[in-house]
């Protein structure tokens, strides 16, 4: 059974108490949530429910908004894709920060704000991950120093994303070309790839195939090929009701 959306095994007791009561709407708890975001960035955890509560406080109290905290939340959300965490967080931000501003005023505001640029760059990364454009994700991430600044506070950002990509690959493939996987995981050498797939994924590297080196993924419930046969039983009594309906006179 999966963990409930509003639960987090690593959540401190004081944060849980705030989220369970009316204090979650108290602006004075903003600093507590902000410190908790810093903690998540440092210890590689992610508490979506608590982060959404902080973004909701920002929504009610725009003067309290800290741009760095918001971008850290979004960067952390990237490390748990393909969950809806990023889109949920993005939906609580001001309209002018959205990737596609809906009116002229929002578009004008978006052109003059470093914060808006940061949000939209992170949204671009999210789009690439969600659409499984992994090689383009890494090339985009490495294309601008601003991306490095936006993810600098998130400990192990690249490693966490790399693991999530591997999980998604494992759901869709039984076998994949090593060169392709190198690009998808942004591992610059064959040695690094072999070490990652062996130690992190427990996958096998096969160098004996006619098509070059391939990585073999063990069978799991997601990538297993299964033939599915569906059959439906239609009883005579079901036809009987249809026939009787045909002889009934309209009222």
From Swiss-Prot:
PANTHER family: EUKARYOTIC TRANSLATION INITIATION FACTOR 3 SUBUNIT 11, EUKARYOTIC TRANSLATION INITIATION FACTOR 3 SUBUNIT K. Residues 46-224 form the PCI domain. Component of the eukaryotic translation initiation factor 3 (eIF-3) complex. Its main location: cytoplasm. Belongs to the eIF-3 subunit K family. Keywords: Cytoplasm, Initiation factor, Protein biosynthesis. The lineage of its organism: Eukaryota, Fungi, Dikarya, Ascomycota, Pezizomycotina. It comes from Aspergillus oryzae (strain ATCC 42149 / RIB 40). The keyword Protein biosynthesis applies. This is Eukaryotic translation initiation factor 3 subunit K. One of its GO terms (biological process) is regulation of translational initiation.
């Amino acid at each position: 059974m999966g963990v409930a959306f509003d639960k987090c095994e690593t959540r401190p007791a004081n944060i849980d108490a705030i989220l369970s009561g009316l204090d979650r709407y108290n602006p004075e708890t903003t600093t507590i949530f902000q410190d908790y975001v810093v903690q998540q960035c440092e210890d590689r955890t992610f508490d979506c429910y608590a982060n959404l509560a902080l973004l909701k406080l920002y929504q009610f109290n725009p003067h309290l908004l800290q741009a760095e905290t918001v971008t850290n939340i979004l960067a952390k959300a990237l490390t748990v894709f393909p969950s809806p965490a990023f889109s949920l967080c993005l939906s609580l931000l001001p309209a002018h920060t959205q990737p596609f501003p809906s009116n002229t005023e929002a578009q004008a505001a978006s052109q003059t704000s470093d914060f808006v640029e940061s949000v939209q760059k992170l949204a671009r990364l999210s789009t690439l991950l969600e659409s499984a454009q992994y090689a383009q994700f890494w090339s985009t991430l490495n294309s601008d120093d601003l991306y490095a600044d936006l993810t600098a506070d998130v400990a192990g950002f690249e490693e966490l994303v790399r693991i999530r990509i591997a999980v998604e690959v494992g759901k869709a493939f039984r076998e994949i070309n090593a060169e392709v996987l190198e690009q998808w995981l942004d591992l610059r050498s064959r040695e690094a790839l072999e070490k990652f797939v062996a130690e992190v994924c427990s996958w096998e590297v096969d160098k004996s195939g006619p098509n070059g080196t391939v990585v073999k993924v063990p069978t799991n419930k997601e990538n297993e090929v299964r033939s599915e046969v569906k059959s439906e039983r239609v009883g005579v009594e079901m036809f009987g009701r249809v026939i009787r309906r045909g002889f009934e006179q309209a009222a």
